[in-house]
From Swiss-Prot:
Role summary: Involved in the biosynthesis of lipid A, a phosphorylated glycolipid that anchors the lipopolysaccharide to the outer membrane of the cell.
GO biological process, one term: lipid A biosynthetic process
The encoding gene: lpxA
Protein name per its UniProtKB record: Acyl-[acyl-carrier-protein]--UDP-N-acetylglucosamine O-acyltransferase
Pathway per the UniProt entry: Glycolipid biosynthesis; lipid IV(A) biosynthesis; lipid IV(A) from (3R)-3-hydroxytetradecanoyl-[acyl-carrier-protein] and UDP-N-acetyl-alpha-D-glucosamine: step 1/6
Annotated EC: 2.3.1.129
C-alpha cells in the first residue's frame, strides 16, 4: 500500500505488497521489494534498493546506491525469510550495505535510531547497532557484531564477527577489532588495543566530572592494576553502586564472549 501523500518517482519500482508511509519520498530508479515497509517521512534519494523482509522507520534519509535487506553473505543461508529492521531519523549515505539476518543468528539485523552510516559502510547479517552511533566511511561490521549506543567506528575499520563494541566507544580509523571493546574506551590499531577513556566524548554528552573520574578508575582496574578480570569484577561492581555509569562495565562483562581487547 502506498499512502496517498507519498511521492514515488515515475522511474522507481515499488512492488505490489510494499508499504510506503505518509509523506515518504521514493526517488528516481529506486527499487522497493514486496515485503518492505517504509515509514512516514523517509526519503530514498535515488538508485536505492530495499529488498527482503525489511522495515524502515520514520524520517530516515537514504542516499543513492544504498542496498538494504539484500541476501546476506553467509554460506549457510538458504533463502529463509529473515529480516532487517531500521529505526528512525538515520542518515544512510551512499553505497551503504545492510544485509538480512540468518536463522542461526536469530534472523534479524537491527539498526536503531539517529545513526550516521557514512559512505560504503557495511553492516553484515545479524548485527545490532544501537542509537546515535557513527560508522565512518568504509567501516565494516562482520556478522553478529553488536555496536552499543553512541559508539563511533572510524573509517576503514573492520570488526570481527561476534565482537561487541561498548557504549561511547571510539575506535580509530584503519583498525582491526578482533575482541570486545568495553564501554567508554578509545581503541586503535590492528589488532586494536586500548588507549584510555573517551573523556572528550563523555564531556560532550553531559557526563559529570565525578562520573568520568569513576569510569577512569574502572578503566585503571581493568587495564593497569595487574589483576585478572575476574579479580577486578567485584571492585567494579562496588564502584557501580555509587556511580551508576560504571554499571555499563558490569553489564558488558556479562555479555562478552570473545574476551577484551588488551
Amino acid at each position: 500500500m502506498i499512502d496517498k501523500s507519498a511521492f514515488v518517482h515515475p522511474t522507481a519500482i515499488v512492488e505490489e505488497g510494499a508499504s510506503i508511509g505518509a509523506n515518504a519520498h521514493i526517488g528516481p530508479f529506486c527499487i522497493v521489494g514486496p515485503h518492505v515497509e517504509i515509514g512516514e517521512g523517509t526519503v530514498l534519494k535515488s538508485h536505492v534498493v530495499v529488498n527482503g523482509h525489511t522495515k524502515i522507520g520514520r524520517d530516515n534519509e537514504i542516499y543513492q546506491f544504498a542496498s538494504i535487506g539484500e541476501v546476506n553473505q553467509d554460506l549457510k543461508y538458504a533463502g529463509e525469510p529473515t529480516r532487517v529492521e531500521i529505526g528512525d531519523r538515520n542518515r544512510i549515505r551512499e553505497s551503504v550495505t545492510i544485509h538480512r539476518g540468518t536463522v542461526q543468528g536469530g534472523g534479524l539485523t537491527k539498526v536503531g535510531s539517529d545513526n550516521l552510516l557514512m559512505i560504503n559502510a557495511h553492516i553484515a547479517h545479524d548485527c545490532t547497532v544501537g542509537n546515535r552511533c557513527i560508522l565512518a566511511n568504509n567501516a565494516t561490521l562482520a556478522g553478529h557484531v553488536s555496536v552499543d549506543d553512541f559508539a563511533i567506528i572510524g573509517g576503514m575499520t573492520a570488526v570481527h564477527q561476534f565482537c561487541i563494541i561498548g557504549a561511547h566507544v571510539m575506535v580509530g580509523g584503519c583498525s582491526g577489532v578482533a575482541q570486545d571493546v568495553p564501554p567508554y574506551v578509545i581503541a586503535q590499531g590492528n589488532h586494536a588495543t586500548p588507549f584510555g577513556v573517551n573523556t572528550e566524548g563523555l564531556k560532550r554528552r553531559g557526563f559529570s566530572r565525578e562520573a568520568i573520574t569513576a569510569i577512569r578508575n574502572a578503566y585503571k582496574l581493568i587495564y593497569r592494576s595487574g589483576k585478572t578480570l575476574d579479580e577486578v569484577k567485584p571492585e567494579i561492581a562496588e564502584l557501580a553502586e555509587t556511580y551508576p555509569e560504571v554499571k555499563a562495565f558490569t553489564d558488558f562483562f556479562a555479555r562478552s564472549t570473545r574476551g577484551l581487547i588488551r
